[in-house]
Regions:
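N-terminal pro-sequences and low-complexity stem/linker regions of secreted or lumenal proteins
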Residues: 1-189
Length: 189
């Protein structure tokens, strides 16, 4: 899940630009690329940025707070734990967590950055079930105050998301994202 505007993947990396939060991630040594019971580092892309100084990564890759998450950065990448992203958990567990995280008393959708139209929430899956298949149609949900209820008729993928974030941050496209259309127009972002 990502709360945007922004793209940590291509932004000039600084603590003012991006924050990566990992649900049930390790404390203190967040840059360690190790698996714990409910956390896997592969879901936090910033851990693999080799040009980011270790001290910066430690400051910008943090455990997901149990209460309010701060939405003060241009881009916040939010990674649920394996139970709440349905890798190891059930759809009911993931739904309950997402409902509380987005719509609960301190949920993202009740916070000023969202209600004022400064935040969009993207929810998508990187693979289907346990197969790891990325070719299957996968859920890709965009939530923002300006996004109407609609279904996209064209295929969307990770590059569509990256292109959208780059556009929202006014950054140049990189790699394969340069060859796809973003989502700003169809989703009124």
């Amino acid at each position: 899940m990502a709360a945007v505007p922004g793209s940590a993947a291509t932004a000039p990396y600084s603590t003012k630009d991006a924050l990566v939060t990992v649900h049930d991630g390790p404390d203190g040594t967040h840059t360690a690329v190790i698996d714990t019971r409910l956390y896997v580092p592969r879901h936090a892309p910033a851990l693999y940025y080799t040009r980011v100084p270790r001290a910066t990564c430690r400051a910008d890759v943090v455990p997901l707070p149990a209460t309010r998450i701060k939405l003060k950065r241009k881009f916040t990448w939010i990674t649920p734990n394996l139970q709440h992203d349905m890798h190891d958990g059930t759809p009911a567990q993931a739904s309950a967590w997402l409902h509380a995280f987005l719509g609960g008393p301190h949920g993202v959708l009740h916070r000023a950055p969202y209600t004022r139209g400064h935040t969009a929430v993207f929810i998508w899956f990187d693979s289907s079930s346990q197969t790891g298949d990325v070719e299957t149609p996968l859920p890709f949900i965009v939530i923002s105050p300006s996004t109407p209820e609609r279904v996209a008729v064209r295929p969307l993928n990770h590059f569509s998301a990256l292109r959208t974030w780059e556009s929202m941050l006014h950054l140049p496209c990189v790699g394969a994202a340069c060859f796809v259309k973003g989502l700003r127009i169809p989703f009124h972002l």
